[in-house]
């Protein structure tokens, strides 16, 4: 799992897990990303390990819509000639309230594994990464529209945050 280096400073057992379960830290330094980070990825992939990167850079809690993707993960995949396993996470609200957050219902997550995206060896890493990123985004949009039965648009509605007990989300 590629994680921001700040996650290594989490309290207690989380810090231990983040440090010792084979995570690859991501440090916001051009020098690190250009020199050390690719070596960490290469080493992991050479040992037949999978690498998990969230290409949208950050997760928004319970946000249902696919986010615009960032090209970095696709660039490294293209550069190392490895596929992208595309996924879409469906979020469904449950009837029970969150224990510590009464403004939210509990939710469940369903991971949909979409068709794998392979690099095109005839393209350079830059063009390949753009093509892979676009294919992945289109797969995520298609999954969203099929699962939720609605066309994707980015106008915000309270429904976009799964489980939110906003008045607009409550039954009439």
Residues covered by each model-derived region:
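Catalytic core of membrane glycerolipid acyltransferases/transacylases, capturing the structured
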Residues: 1-31
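Non-catalytic C-terminal accessory region of glycerolipid acyltransferases
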Residues: 35-172
């Amino acid at each position: 799992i590629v994680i921001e280096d700040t996650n290594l400073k989490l309290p207690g057992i989380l810090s231990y897990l983040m440090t010792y379960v084979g995570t690859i830290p991501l440090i916001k330094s051009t020098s690190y990303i250009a020199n050390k980070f690719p070596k960490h990825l290469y080493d992991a992939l050479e040992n037949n390990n999978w690498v998990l990167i969230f290409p949208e850079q950050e997760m928004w809690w319970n946000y249902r819509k696919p986010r615009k993707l960032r090209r970095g993960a696709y660039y490294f995949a293209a550069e190392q000639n490895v596929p992208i396993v595309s996924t879409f996470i469906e979020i469904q609200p449950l009837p029970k309230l969150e224990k510590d957050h009464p403004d939210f219902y509990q939710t469940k997550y369903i991971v949909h594994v979409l068709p794998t995206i392979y690099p095109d060896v005839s393209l350079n890493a830059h063009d390949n990464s753009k093509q892979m990123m676009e294919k992945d985004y289109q797969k995520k949009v298609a999954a969203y529209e099929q699962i939720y039965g609605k066309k994707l648009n980015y106008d915000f509605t309270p429904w976009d945050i799964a489980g939110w007990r906003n008045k607009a989300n409550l039954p009439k």
